[in-house]
Amino acid sequence: MKNLLTNPQPSQSDYINAIVKLGSRVYEAATVTPLQKMGKLSDRLHNNIWIKREDRQPVNSFKLRGAYAMISSLSDEQKQSGVIAASAGNHAQGVALSAKQLGLKALIVMPQNTPSIKVDAVRGFGGEVLLHGANFDEAKAKAIELSKSKHMTFIPPFDHPLVIAGQGTLAMEMLQQVADLDYVFVQVGGGGLAAGIAILLKQFMPEIKVIGVESKDSACLNAALEKGEPTDLAHVGLFADGVAVKRIGDETFRLCQKYLDGMVLVDSDEVCAAMKDLFENVRAVAEPSGALGLAGLKKYVKQNNLEGKNMAAILSGANLNFHTLRYVSERCEIGENREALLAVTMPEQPGSFLKFAHVIGNRAVTEFSYRYADNQKACIFVGVRTANEAEKSEIIADLTKNGFDVEDMSDDDIAKTHVRYLMGGRVSNHHERLYSFEFPEQKGALLKFLEILGKRWNISLFHYSAHGADYGNILAAFQLGEKDNAEFEQALAELGYVYEDVTESKAYRYFLR
């Protein structure tokens, strides 16, 4: 264990020895979680699929393992001074409960916009909370500063050998629960869980393939593997906030690069579909990052036409805002190819709708939106229930054959998040530009937006969509003159919100411009 405290790059044998020794200590706080068979999904995918229920830990996530492993290994002098961490999520609760179990002081620095439910959860586990900074980076900088001035030990969320070894205890349990696994799928944020699982499985059962799974919009490990070293992402998506990490850890990268057998990237819709599978199969309500491993498993099976394999994924956590489920319920059908979203152009004349309805036939229409634009043609937004990708292609082919122009919007995020609710008609102002923003869910956010952007330029479209997360999505259009671009870009920089120019979006072009 001493090697893991002092050596930033321990050997595989050092890790294995530490994981084995921690196998008793970690359970002073954590519990052995079940590896549960997913019967319905196994039948559907023609493989035996198990899910590791880390949502059943006392803090409802695997993070307790790594936090307790490191904190319990500190010297008496370090324990007396207490521990400090920066987190707005599961790591914060893991550190707080670990410290409480060991009778230590724990200070958790959280961003000022952290939802009260997360702050209360940390306090409920005995942690002291300091709200500081506008984002995680500022909170982390403050935590490191305080760790030095108060002589407290900083507990990192993933990039420390003891944290990695603590997460590896999960793999020891899996080997005891199902001995003949062929694949294990592990979500990757900072890489601590994947590194800990992979290094142990490759020691005892090297034939098991360990596959890392990342969200497409926060794939920091995949970016590092392509570059050959850890690198900063320009932007990370926040739906699966538990894996929204800008840069993979140095040690976790070293281990993942060496021991992982492959990577799978999934999108938010695929994660939503996996969340639905977890509920339908084992009645578990996972947070988005908690379902990431299962989403990757399903995609990997489809891509590689696998059958008859024994496969496991990790349900890493279940700390989610209840309102997130509204978004999940809307998007899970698309993630399973059970709903097609289409833009269909037809003549603006009597009988066109009837002809369209005959082509669709008895298929279930999930939504239908239309707004008159001109007397030449009409463009409708329609959702149709489908059995699979093949049926969607069949619908598009049938509509095209009958003289309708069809554009598939199923993968257009602007269409799925905003435009489906904005059938208000087109504008004649060709100087309008459309932007999407990640909007912090905090008091004063809208006021700041309007004070910086709403005084100087006319806002001609505005739609807000909440995910039940720390950030929501806003779609806004501005009427800009040709000379406004430089000043507007400067105002966007002053605003400080993550944004993207989506003026060329297909959905905008079809329905709103």
Where are these regions (language model features)?
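PLP-dependent amino-acid enzyme catalytic core
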Residues: 1-445, 449-513
